[in-house]
Amino acid sequence: MKVLYTSDLHGEIHLYHELLSLAIASSSEVIMVGGDLLPSFPPTKRYEDMVPNQKTFVDQFLSPLLKRVLEATSVRQIFLIPGNWDLGYPHLFKESMEGIIDLSQRSYRLKNGYELIGYPFVPPTPFRPKDFEKMDDKEAPWPPQKNPSYIRSSDQTDQLTPIDPYPYLRGRETIEEDLNHLPKPLRQKRTIYIMHSPPFGTRLDLIQGGKSAGSRSIKTFIEEHQPLLTLHGHIHESPEFSGAYLDRIGETLSINPGQFTWASRDVSKLHAVTFEMEKIEETLMHTCFPKVRSD
């Protein structure tokens, strides 16, 4: 089964058009998008306009495009999770769309017997939207927070509620706790996890200065459960700084394709990978990086 994976498109229309072109060129059967699908900031740069702008993007562009992908290509299923900027994500599923599947904290068994499991949350960032942020674990350090930060009041309203991020995040379950409650697959060696945050301390989570910004709990989860493959995003620039878009944690292959990084200033080329699910390493290709070894 041919898979196309990307992440962090942030409402960039030209990247979505490239996604459609790549789906056609690669004859992909499944598309997976690992979060941050929607525009981060509205043209007004006002947080109160963020959700209405994202909903407009969904209605006028994204939903029609995804339907077009399913109609005009060999793609039969599109799996999505939100990222930390996707406060308007529930609007994508206001109506059922055949072939477009919300994988957030859910599992899905494909016709070939492989299982997909999605997880959207990331450790605290310096940014203000907090719907999809949680403490990594009770001891993990945080970056300085901006006060006020914002959460969406509910899925039924566009209103954002200002919050003090420190008590808000301390009052939520941690990523570590969440991961223990994810659906349990039948066989880890035939399971692919789509997680917006990359694992900490790998070649997939490097930011400027060589610091790691991924999730310690996600790395521990991968070490302990050893799934076939994990797919990530969030840290756009990591492949640029580490020189690699894949890493190995035990026997698990982990991938962060990156996206239009500030280091290269290349915003015109979609960062994505394609592969055959039954022989991932032999067929893995990146749109911007040469084929590399994972060991």
Predicted features along the sequence, with ranges:
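Active-site-proximal loop/helix segment associated with metal-binding centers of metalloenzymes
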Residues: 114-208
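Binuclear metal-dependent phosphoesterase catalytic core
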Residues: 107-112, 216-224, 238-295
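Proline-aspartate-enriched helix->loop->beta-strand connector
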Residues: 28-32, 218-232
